[in-house]
Amino acid sequence: MFVRLTRKDDGGAVYVNAAQVRGVSEERDVTWVYVGKLAYMVEESAKAVVTLLEAEMNGGFLK
């Protein structure tokens, strides 16, 4: 599963999967996803998918 993210600095887009994500945070109305040393803004339409990414990062819904 890949999610389209927008770079914080120049607005360029990138596609990442859960294996590449090292963290997710919420600031005001914006969701940031951290990949390597870069922060990416999640497009509004992808927020539900980021929830799935977080679950995948944390070993799935069931442990």
Q: Which role does the model predict for each range below?
A:
Residues 1-63:
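Eukaryotic intrinsically disordered, low-complexity regulatory linkers and tails enriched in Ser/Thr/Pro
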